[in-house]
Structure formats: C-alpha cells, structure tokens
Amino acid sequence: MKSTLRISLKSGERIFVNGAVLRVDRKVAVEFLNDVTFLLENHVLQPEDATTPLRQLYFIAQMILINPEGAEQSTAMFRKSIVMLLACFKNEEVLAELKRIDGLVTQGRAFEALKAIRGLYPIEERILNNQEITPATIDQIRKEIAPWR
C-alpha cells in the first residue's frame, strides 16, 4: 500500500480484517497504515443470496478473504467455478472479464476480483432474463457449487 487508507464505520457495523471479524460499538474512523486484506460488511454476500452463477463465484472469492485458513480450498473451488463459467457464458465481455478476474485471484488480488464480479451483475441479469444460459445449465452450476457451501 503506497498510502494510508481511511474508512468510516457506523455504530454496530462489522468489518472483516485479515480473517478476523470486528464490530464497532460507535461511529469510528479506522486508518490502515500498511497492507491489509479487509471486506466491509455491506460487501459480504450471504450464502442464501448466492443465487446466480456470478454471485456464487463472488461468494467463493470472498471466502478467500474472509477465511484465510481455508483460502487454498476456496481458491481451488474458485478455479473449478471459473472453468465452468467460461464454458457456459457466450457473451464476449463477460468472458474477457472472467479471464481478468481469474488473473486477479491468481495474483492474490481477490478484493479487486470481487469488485470486478459485482460489475458483471447487470450483464448477468440481462443474460439470465433473456435465457441466454439455459436453466438446466444454471442448475448444473448450482449443483457443483452448493455442496461446497
């Protein structure tokens, strides 16, 4: 990190820092003075909300950050999921971004990968609404990923 990073948290808000969960009891500003892996509570996707292929990928990628002890298992599942998604999506923009996201995770930049995945949600919604990916394919992806959660 070239400069410090300052974030503000509201009373009761949680933040995930290097695998630990912290909750603040009052409004506070936190300044990170060195490299840190963190995820704000409002960016944490709950398992029951991982209802689409990209949201499932997001859930897996966030586990790399939230659970450092299980990062190896999460990364393996991420790789398996990326391969499946690259085979399912036909949209060139999505395919190019998935390849970039895979590179980010490979480089240890899972936080940036999460932001990129969130950026694909509107395109995914359009694809799913137009049934450019068949419901059977989506069900297959869910079956592959669901046991891991």
Curated annotation (Swiss-Prot):
GO biological process annotation, one example: bacterial-type flagellum organization
Superkingdom: Bacteria
Family label: Belongs to the FlbT family.
Function: Has a post-transcriptional repressor function in flagellum biogenesis. Associates with the 5'-UTR of fljK mRNA and promotes its degradation.
Keywords: Bacterial flagellum biogenesis, Repressor, RNA-binding
GO molecular function ontology, one term from the record: mRNA 5'-UTR binding
Name of the protein in its database record: Probable flagellum biosynthesis repressor protein FlbT
Cross-referenced InterPro entries: Flagellum_FlbT
Organism, as annotated: Sinorhizobium fredii (strain NBRC 101917 / NGR234)
